[in-house]
């Protein structure tokens, strides 16, 4: 029998514990509660949050009446886009046909929402007219505003070697670009964006994966890698920040803070940036950088129909992009208690990740049913989110935290120092989370 090191044994044991713990938790969650509550439930959005809510509600309600409105043909595992863009996954690994993912007791209207009127409890769709509801689950996801970066559109993504993994085709193009850049060398620029966006760690991941891929190809010396962030710090969760900054320094990747992308000249391969050190709009320095390979993050917001519905925050830091106003603990709208919102569209001060949704779903489902029963919602969400920052092919810095940016380890990793990157977390990211998504989470298990 082949011997394994104590370190590998501990990590393998932790990984086994993750799978077992998730399975046990999922079974317990979906069998502990049932209700006779009735009402027309409409779910806008059939992504991670929408399908998971539908699946769990149909298990918990004895007489479910659930309609899902979503236009998509495919169900994407979006956290896998980074792994497509780095060659770990094949494109076919991260999607399934949507019709095979819709819960069997839910009605699917394959359409887009045009307007939403919470006063009339009414939704107008593009092709199916008006739909009324008693209770609304608002999970439409996020709107990517490619047009807010001058000089490039969704259609022209990839031209001038300017790429983004926030798109399925874009992730595939990014992988080709990384391989080519490793051969040619030059200057690579990676950026985030000034709005809240899906998985804030993704731009950091693809930067570090590009670096590691080049090292494995023995071509790293031929390239210069620079990372630009709009924030005054590389990462805003203190428990994990020191090691992440150290990794960038060790890899010789320069970090520029307080800087955002304004536009891209794909013909001449120039990126136009604005640096603002003081948060004063009059104290802005414009910068132009040449590049050979660019990965940028487009601005994002709530969908237009949400912004026009009156459900968004009207003031504060979450108002600018139209994020839905909800109680950050119960996830219920303060002015319309028959509306609950979770996922990327929710205006809550935490990261927009699949892991956050996984924790929000059982809380939102229970509180919605309590509302249907004319009871006060009692379940509370603590802001848990997780961002597995891939630092190289084989290690992940698993960042788990709450609203207060305190560490919130939910997996059996306490025997390791999770302020540093770990092999077991890489196994979790690449081997466990995708099956958990397709076979557990969107089927109402594994919360």
Please annotate each region the language model reported.
Residues 30-107, 194-238:
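Beta1-alpha1 glycine-rich phosphate/pyrophosphate-binding loop at the start
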Residues 141-218:
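Glycine-rich dinucleotide-binding loop and its adjacent helix/turn
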Residues 369-408:
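Active-site-proximal substrate-binding core of FAD-dependent oxidoreductases
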Residues 156-182, 287-359:
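FAD-site-proximal beta/loop scaffold in flavoenzymes
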Residues 398-447:
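C-terminal auxiliary extensions adjacent to catalytic cores
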Residues 106-115, 131, 215-321:
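A Rossmann-like FAD-binding core segment of flavoenzymes
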Residues 345-375, 379-381:
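A conserved FAD-binding loop/helix module that cradles the flavin
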Residues 1-17:
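N-terminal secretory signal peptides and thylakoid transit peptides that target proteins
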């Amino acid at each position: 029998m082949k011997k394994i090191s104590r370190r590998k044994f501990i990590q393998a044991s932790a990984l086994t514990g993750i799978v077992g713990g998730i399975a046990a938790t999922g079974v317990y969650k979906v069998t502990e509660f049932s209700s006779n509550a009735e009402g027309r439930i409409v779910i806008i959005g059939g992504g991670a949050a929408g399908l998971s809510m539908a699946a769990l509600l149909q298990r918990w309600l004895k007489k479910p009446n659930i309609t899902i409105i979503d236009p998509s043909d495919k169900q994407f595992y979006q956290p896998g886009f980074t792994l497509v863009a780095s060659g770990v996954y094949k494109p076919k690994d991260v999607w399934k046909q949507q019709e095979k993912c819709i819960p069997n007791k839910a009605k699917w209207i394959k359409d887009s929402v045009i307007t939403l009127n919470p006063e009339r409890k009414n939704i107008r769709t593009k092709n199916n007219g008006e739909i009324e509801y008693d209770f609304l689950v608002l999970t439409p996801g996020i709107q990517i505003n490619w047009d807010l970066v001058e000089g490039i559109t969704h259609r022209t993504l990839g031209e001038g070697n300017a790429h983004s993994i926030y798109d399925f085709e874009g992730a595939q193009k990014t992988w080709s670009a990384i391989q080519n850049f490793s051969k040619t060398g030059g200057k690579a620029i990676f950026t985030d964006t000034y709005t809240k966006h899906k998985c804030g760690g993704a731009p950091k991941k693809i930067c570090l994966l590009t670096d590691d891929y080049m090292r494995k190809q023995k071509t790293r010396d031929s390239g210069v890698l620079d990372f630009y962030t709009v924030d005054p710090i590389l990462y805003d969760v203190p428990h994990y920040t020191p090691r992440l900054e150290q990794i960038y320094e060790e890899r010789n990747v320069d970090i520029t803070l307080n800087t955002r992308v304004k536009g891209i000249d794909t013909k001449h391969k120039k990126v136009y940036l604005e640096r603002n050190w003081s948060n004063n709009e009059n104290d802005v320095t414009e910068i132009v950088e040449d590049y050979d390979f660019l990965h940028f993050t487009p601005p994002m917001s709530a969908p237009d129909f949400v912004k026009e519905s009156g459900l968004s925050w009207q003031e504060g830091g979450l108002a600018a992009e139209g994020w839905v106003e909800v109680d950050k603990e119960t996830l219920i709208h303060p002015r319309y208690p028959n509306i609950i919102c979770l996922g990327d569209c929710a205006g809550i001060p935490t990261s927009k990740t699949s892991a956050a949704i996984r924790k929000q779903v059982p809380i939102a489902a229970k509180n919605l049913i309590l509302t249907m029963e004319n009871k006060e919602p009692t379940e509370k969400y603590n802001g848990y989110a997780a961002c597995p920052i891939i630092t190289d092919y084989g290690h992940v810095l698993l960042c788990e935290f709450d609203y207060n940016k305190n560490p919130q380890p939910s997996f059996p990793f306490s025997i390791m120092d999770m302020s540093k990157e770990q092999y077991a977390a890489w196994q979790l990211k690449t081997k466990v989370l995708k099956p958990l998504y397709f076979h557990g989470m969107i089927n109402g298990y594994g919360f």
